[in-house]
Amino acid sequence: MEKTYNPQDIEQPLYEHWEKQGYFKPNGDESQESFCIMIPPPNVTGSLHMGHAFQQTIMDTMIRYQRMQGKNTLWQVGTDHAGIATQMVVERKIAAEEGKTRHDYGREAFIDKIWEWKAESGGTITRQMRRLGNSVDWERERFTMDEGLSNAVKEVFVRLYKEDLIYRGKRLVNWDPKLRTAISDLEVENRESKGSMWHIRYPLADGAKTADGKDYLVVATTRPETLLGDTGVAVNPEDPRYKDLIGKYVILPLVNRRIPIVGDEHADMEKGTGCVKITPAHDFNDYEVGKRHALPMINILTFDGDIRESAQVFDTKGNESDVYSSEIPAEFQKLERFAARKAVVAAVDALGLLEEIKPHDLTVPYGDRGGVVIEPMLTDQWYVRADVLAKPAVEAVENGDIQFVPKQYENMYFSWMRDIQDWCISRQLWWGHRIPAWYDEAGNVYVGRNEEEVRKENNLGANVALRQDEDVLDTWFSSALWTFSTLGWPENTDALRQFHPTSVMVSGFDIIFFWIARMIMMTMHFIKDENGKPQVPFHTVYMTGLIRDDEGQKMSKSKGNVIDPLDMVDGISLPELLEKRTGNMMQPQLADKIRKRTEKQFPNGIEPHGTDALRFTLAALASTGRDINWDMKRLEGYRNFCNKLWNASRFVLMNTEGQDCGFNGGEMTLSLADRWILAEFNQTIKAYREALDSFRFDIAAGILYEFTWNQFCDWYLELTKPVMNGGTEAELRGTRHTLVTVLEGLLRLAHPIIPFITETIWQRVKVLCGITADTIMLQPFPQYDASQVDEAALADTEWLKQAIVAVRNIRAEMNIAPGKPLELLLRGCSADAERRVNENRGFLQTLARLESITVLPADDKGPVSVTKIIDGAELLIPMAGLINKEDELARLAKEVAKIEGEISRIENKLANEGFVARAPEAVIAKEREKLEGYAEAKAKLIEQQAVIAAL
């Protein structure tokens, strides 16, 4: 084997070999249980980020683990067309390169342009997924707009429409005036900002007066421009100031519209003035109030967010109405919305109706892609009736057909599903699945799989002109069909029969409603088992937290704290990293701050760590459902782990290749250490499998690390040296056999998490075991064997380890050279301790570097010594001639003084109010941690001073 572990040399060639050999495909053995995971489809033109790397590592670990258990495994791969994101990328591209807009191209030509862009950049993310070691079946790769999936989408739309579960209606949506499309709640980013609350007088009609004799109500609003669309004023029905006015009217300033005063809980007596203006067409809460009181809806804005020339007036059901005039005062027409705000305030003030302006903290919704303030907008959209679909989806989780890991996410799911709103599925974009609906000139709507079917079903001759709906479906609509459409539905395919319901879905909790819930609803509606019972899309939902930076901040381009997973695999120089973080920025003014932060964090760029180290780190950090703060030190630690495993394997091979390892018969004697490591290994298998079976990848990674590093490398390899240097033939055979057996099993155990290094080493080790198979990927996963757990060997070895560690600690504390042989005395020995010493003298002397071991008679106190107590005995190392008492005390005093200096420095820092107020919580916690560490170190040094002073 190569002397040094170099992941760059082994990873890519290995992956190509696995893929070429077809090892990622299902084994097709239908006598075995199936295990299937659907990959959450990443954006086709995107690139891999830490969230992908994290989730895909978890999925690949599960898939490899189940594949090694002989299951018929499928990891279904595919990408998402990502409507709005992809369209925006291409729009920006043609604007930058050609100075054109999509309208210059026209719909067909622009869509062709997007397909070109997909062909050009669509392979990036799949190439990156290969670099991660993902064992997905590439031959089954799907795309949400491929022909098969597009047919499934049409089929679902048509069936839901025919069942009256899809309808077209006028409703309020989040409208992005820059992108000119409806967007989902997930694409809205709420930002805190300082604003104003305007208090405006609305004169009472018909001579009415308030309880305190005023002839007006004062309405408080943060959006005075929407006053032009008010159709009511709400007061709380319990409010003594106004309850007698319910049913009376006010005259709306500027427009002179007569609008009713309604009693509604939405008006809070404690907030503002207790009177709230109601604008059902421009506010989500007002829309609901308007529905409750059958108020008309008046839309005053264009799709660009400007004031209309004349308003659109609708009744509460969304039908056009003439209950109010559609006139808008000329001075406000065509004004941009924020200019209109100023103009309305000035006009109200001129009439003497502006009572006061108060500063007010606001939460303002912005579109996360367009970057402008979102406007609630009354538009015609297509909707799915969600309550009917939600009922079985709630029951599936209630009765345990679907389980959430961790369980607490069930509550989040229930709270949303039990109060579900109809789902707006239309988007005013060009890229996506076009809605399969056609209109004739009279405005009648026809829904079908294609125009030909529509004409045939509705007896429409060629003379009837039809135009297809311009809108496309929300990307989440096609994603909701992902578990079954990818397997060939609506055809009843073998794949659907074998792999559906799927086993586990791995997802971030942020899309529990947008994706998880909708998959459950859609799947249960369309997929039934042979008895007609609705099928669930998956049995388990494993929820991951978000990966944040080392300070707990969300990773984002604007913060400049994004780490590309492949930069940790391959390494990246500082100039390249700076270019990546500051090039093509939406907000170039942040570049300087980002540059400084990056230079401080990565002065030499990022070292290459290899894929296995990255995967191990991700698995180790995967504590269920909590957000994860990324830690480069952990990554370095797991890179060191891979080195340690490599070097340990080289040690095993150097001592076993070309030797008799007992695999072809011959007498074998197992030493205590051999019996101990076999027992340890089997206990490790048991605990590790339990962790993987319960989705505790962090615990599994910890178990693997602890056994490999501490038990196998640090102890067992050391404990084999006495046999290797002077054992009998039978003992040598026994130890070599154990070395090879445990290493080979350990490689299989670790393979799901770190596939590349384990396959590479296993190719050498398999020869010694007489295994002829081509790959570790298809080897059986280790099984726990209780007969291998020798309790006596475990107890005896743990005692020996305690004794060796005690001697090593005395050396370290007393500053005695590691190579200097020592005399060991044992006082107050139990029978067990004496037996252990007598049976394992050779081990003890070699590993603790002892000249002699003496068990003192019961009444012998022994000479002046440093002592340690272990189970059933007291260990003594006589100090005569070992140290110079004065020198040692002086050295310790110097150490104590140095540590006291550090302690007072940190205490002063933490006592500084300015520092504590400004510094992030994580920095303060780090300082406190350092302080604790120094205090512990000081206590240990003082203890040592006392021991030496007493000599």
UniProtKB/Swiss-Prot annotation:
**Which catalysed reactions does the entry list for this protein?**
tRNA(Val) + L-valine + ATP = L-valyl-tRNA(Val) + AMP + diphosphate
Domain of life of the source: Bacteria
| Annotated compartments | Cytoplasm
Question: E.C. number, please?
Answer: 6.1.1.9
Q: What is its main location?
A: cytoplasm
Q: Which UniProt keywords apply?
A: Aminoacyl-tRNA synthetase, ATP-binding, Coiled coil, Cytoplasm, Ligase, Nucleotide-binding, Protein biosynthesis
State how it assembles: Monomer.
In UniProt terms, what function does this protein have?
Catalyzes the attachment of valine to tRNA(Val). As ValRS can inadvertently accommodate and process structurally similar amino acids such as threonine, to avoid such errors, it has a 'posttransfer' editing activity that hydrolyzes mischarged Thr-tRNA(Val) in a tRNA-dependent manner.
Q: Which residues form a coiled coil?
A: 880-944
* Protein biosynthesis found in the keyword field: yes
- Keyword Cell cycle found: no
Please give a single GO biological process term from the UniProt record.
Answer: valyl-tRNA aminoacylation
Q: Motif location ('KMSKS' region)? A: 554-558
Q: Which Pfam families match?
A: Anticodon_1, tRNA-synt_1, Val_tRNA-synt_C
- Annotated domain remarks: ValRS has two distinct active sites: one for aminoacylation and one for editing. The misactivated threonine is translocated from the active site to the editing site.
Protein name, entry field: Valine--tRNA ligase
Species per Swiss-Prot/TrEMBL record: Shigella flexneri
